[in-house]
Amino acid sequence: MPSYSIIENFEVHKNNRFLEIAEALKPELLHKEIKAEKEIMVEKDRQMRTVITEEHPIENLYAKSLKRDDTVFVDFGDHAVGYVTLELSKTGSHQDAPVYFYLKFGERLEEMTDKTADYDGWLSRGWIQEEYIHVDVLPAKVKLPRRYSFRYMELRVIDTSAKFQLKINGISCDTVSAVDMESVKPVDFGDPLLNQIDLVSRKTLKECMQDVFEDGPKRDRRMWLGDLRLQARANYYTFKNYDLAKRCMYIFAGLLFNEGKLSACVFTEPEMEPDDTYLLDYALFFSSVLLDYYEATGDLETLRDLYDVAIDQIRIAMTQLNEKNVVEDLGDAFWCFLDWGDGLNKQAGATAVLIYCIRYGIRLAKILDKQEDISWLEEKQAMLKEAAVKEFWDEELGMFVSGPDRQASWATQIWMILARVFDKETNCKLIHHVMEVNPRIRMVTPYMYHHYIDALIRCDEKELALEEMKRYWGEMIRDGADTFWELYNPYNREESPYGSSMVNSYCHAWSCTPTYFLRKFYMDNEK
């Protein structure tokens, strides 16, 4: 089902002081030129998986003369985000017609064999990374103005003429990021797979750290509040770019809309502008983002500046309770995220997120000695916990249920555990019961798996959390991930919430958090 929001009578309330602070923190991006490494041949195998059948030094490609319908594939050796340049010339007689060719860029190998003409998803096909280019005069240096996120490139010659052929003399990419991989010291966790998971996590985060924390450099190329929360946590244990996190918080806080609500995401070009999308859980997470930042930096001035915005999101959410003192169920409308799970009911999970974020609000209020807010928040927290158990706990199932159909899902249980509705001992029993029962509505995104790992650790199941991390993110690596993906279902690698995996993001911010867990909770394993 398409998930988007259009808010009628949408009004943006800008705080120019906040936006000026954010602009002053805009990073100067780091540039590094990399060159194509190999020419490869790709095809589908018997299992219909894309495989490399041959690979040659890139000089092999540069020695070729290409004519109509010739297709070549290039491997840059690792994921890259940046601007591609092709150095072209010709062989044969004088160029008597434009050379016309097609380019496609892919974050994973499968994109090289995707038939883009067959795309039938509900997101814009404009997200597919392809170009049709005419070059009137050769030799030429063709610099693509659009930033691409990729490892692999296809070039197909649509036409030259009978008198000349196209020659490629060089392919390079001017990569960009706010941070440098070399600035983070590698850690040996005593397990090669964990070391690789940590590396790929950091690579994923680095590629998404641009002018802001982007959700994905291929798609959506903008800033989502739920992603920011996880990216910032990983950043504090790796690149430690505190200014970028501060910048992003001030952007969100400087672009409130109706009733003081925070937008779920912000567009960064041509100027900062909030999307007319409100997600209850994402807005509430601002309290978590703010406290995480304060604990990492001790920046009390920023906490004072942004405190009211964080607490207001809790006040707004409290107006969305029903007569039973739990969050009103808005059904299939795009009102709360939690996960992309098909059919996932979000009422109980949203209530749990509210309880969870009130705990962060209380901690913020205590730092600033806001006694009235502390009393109000503690009262509402107790009320919500009592209501959540009364409305959602099913004694017979031994799990929380959600919505009119009393649905039991992984997401609901995990968020109730993180909300600490029960004590730790009961939560530990619950998480093991969920693993044994394995509710039909499963987790499908690394975003939800992050919260699963978090819940395990909070239940003192650190070793189990480590094994689950290795199982999920490790399997992604075995499936070819250079950077971690937006969505990963080991049982259906082509699953997509958008109707086609062609527009899935294969370098996605919310999947970068294994490095956060490893470096925060497992550094004692360092050799």
Q: Which residue stretches match the model-derived regions?
A:
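Active-site core of glycosidic bond-cleaving carbohydrate-active enzymes
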Residues: 224-239, 243-527
